Regions:
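C-terminal regions of mature proteins
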Residues: 1-3, 103, 109-211, 220-224, ...
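Active/ligand-binding-proximal structured segments within catalytic/core domains
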Residues: 2-34, 99, 229-241
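Short acidic (Asp/Glu) and glycine-rich catalytic loops that position anionic groups and cofactors
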Residues: 4-5, 50-55, 72, 120-124, ...
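Short beta-strand-to-loop capping motifs
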Residues: 5-7, 61-65, 158-160, 221-223, ...
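Short, conserved charged micro-motifs
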Residues: 12-14, 68-70, 164-169, 228-231, ...
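M16/insulysin-pitrilysin zinc metalloprotease superfamily fold
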Residues: 16, 26, 30, 34, ...
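A short linear hydrophobic-aromatic micro-motif
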Residues: 44-46, 256-262
């Protein structure tokens, strides 16, 4: 069982982020002996944590017991009636403060956190979080716990050995213990990231650990809103580049011990990352070698023999369409589409089909257009973590971020200048998505409200085609409600329980 709780009354900024994290910690503290430990002895796994957007939390329960619903209900009852013990609060606050200070001691993690602070609409530096924690009192957290349930929205995935009636019963009992009302349409929490302008944007940051010897250079290329075609290219590019990147920069040039590339989809905005960690070379030299490799990679693809390209492409398709190994893997796959609130349970199938049709030349041209550092058309962010042997330049074109030193934190200012990309996904689209009318107008409206924007500028001509709309109509028709007319989930302001589609990914 998985539950995602959205709470619009979480305050903005670092103080609100720490409130939700300490709230979760105090819930864990309260249920540890009475609920968590007995559940653990019974073979159940329970985890609760703040959501990635800090606008709620996620509760997950796994196990073979038929008491999972009772455990979930116990957690929700505790959360909606939480009383803060001052002594336990101070203990948990101290633990969290230590975690905040230690999180970015690793330079690679430091670089990732710096990028998140730059991009995410709702994020803050570790220093801001630490300051917020130090100012927080037990009374602040109690007021927060009493006020956040004015409006709430809970989405759940229940999968495994339970019937629809049992699932509806769990949902109804949890709904009954929620004291507030549904979230108004104009109050939904937003999860957006900054729109990186065209060009290169460099940020130099001093390592937090004064004795650190490893430098890190992290490249990030923003590609725009997530589409099937965009995901297909970026997933294929990762597989094509990974081995050659490691061979060139790690094996041949011995640039650094850790060399990697990966695709990114923070809040359903596509990006591509390349990272190198080096103890021997200054960040500007590491960056120059990374840029040289990326500039040469389209030509490497052009010269790649057809058999090798076909083999790599087919392996990517096979991996996407592979059967789930167990129920947990299947649940995680479905849950990802609920968390991003796009509900595109068939997305992997469409992405795999597009990958199978991408030619070697198309892959090389795509790389030339999007994954080229310092090119005018690319949207490129470069984060440099400077260790003690290679300090941050006193003068230069780089921005200096307040992430462990005394420099001015310009992340909030930059996000105001850069602007934000549109919100992706919509939780209120569930009912239309699951129960579409036969009319094409309703189907098109359901598609638009679930984030597959057929009229967006980022969509290609192929994605706008009538055949895609027809395919969406077929997909939507497969998602049918199983609830009876008298089911509690049919009441006003609620959505139906439904059976997840059978096609893989």
């Amino acid at each position: 069982m998985y539950f995602q709780v959205s709470l619009p009354h979480v305050p903005e900024g670092a103080f609100g982020m720490m409130l939700i994290q300490l709230f979760v910690a105090m819930v864990e503290d309260c249920v540890n002996e009475s609920v968590y430990y007995p559940a653990h002895l019974a073979g159940m796994e329970v985890d609760i944590g703040a959501s990635a957007s800090y606008s709620g939390f996620v509760l997950s329960l796994e196990g073979l017991s038929d008491k999972l619903g009772e455990v979930a209900l116990s957690y929700f009852k505790t959360m909606t009636s939480l009383k803060i013990d001052a002594d336990r609060f101070e203990k948990r606050k101290e633990e969290r403060l230590r975690d905040v200070h230690n999180l970015c001691l690793n330079p690679a993690r430091h670089a990732k956190r710096a990028l998140e602070v730059l991009l995410k609409q709702k994020d803050a530096t570790q220093e801001d979080k630490a300051n917020a924690l130090q100012e927080m009192t037990a009374a602040d957290l109690q007021a927060f716990a009493d006020g956040i349930w004015q409006h709430a929205h809970v989405e759940s995935l229940m999968i495994g050995n339970l019937t629809k009636d049992e699932a509806c019963d769990v949902g109804e009992r949890i709904r009954a213990c929620l004291p507030g009302a549904p979230i108004p349409d104009n109050s939904w929490p937003e999860t957006r990231i900054a729109r990186v302008p065209q060009g290169a944007h460099l940020f130099s940051i001093k390592a937090i650990n004064a004795d650190e010897t490893n430098n890190v250079v992290l490249y990030y290329f923003q590609l725009g809103e997530s589409t099937w075609r965009g995901r297909a290219f970026i997933i294929l590019m990762q597989s094509l580049m990974h081995e050659k990147l490691f061979d060139q920069l790690r094996t041949k040039e011995t640039l650094g011990y850790s060399v990697s590339c990966s695709f990114d989809s923070t809040h359903e905005i596509l990006g591509y990352r390349v990272s190198v960690e080096s103890a021997f070379h200054p960040p500007h030299f590491v960056s120059s070698r990374m840029a040289a490799f990326l500039r040469s990679f389209p030509e490497i693809l052009d010269n790649m023999d057809d058999a090798s390209y076909e083999k790599t492409r087919q392996s990517v398709v096979d991996d996407i369409l592979a059967d789930d190994v167990n129920l947990r893997e299947e649940a995680i796959r479905h849950w990802a589409h609920l968390v991003n609130q796009k509900y595109q349970f068939h997305r992997g199938r469409h992405v795999a089909q597009i990958i199978s049709e991408i030619s070697k030349r198309e892959a090389a041209d795509w790389c030339r257009e999007f994954i080229q550092p310092f090119a005018p058309g690319s949207r490129h962010v470069s984060v440099h973590i400077h260790a003690k042997n290679h300090p941050v330049p006193a003068n230069g074109s780089e921005h200096a971020l307040g992430m462990g030193d005394a420099h001015f934190d310009i992340s909030a200012e930059l996000k105001n200048v850069w602007g934000l990309l549109p919100q992706q996904g919509c939780a209120t689209a569930v009912e239309e998505l699951i129960m579409p009318d036969s009319s094409s107008g309703t189907i098109h409206r359901a598609v638009a409200r679930t984030g597959q924007n057929l009229d967006a500028d980022t969509e290609s001509t192929q994605d706008k085609s009538l055949s895609l709309r027809s395919q969406w109509a077929a997909d939507l028709a497969e998602m049918r409600s199983e609830c009876g007319a008298s089911c509690a989930c049919r009441r006003a302001k609620t959505g139906p329980v439904f059976v997840l589609p059978t096609p893989k990914k």
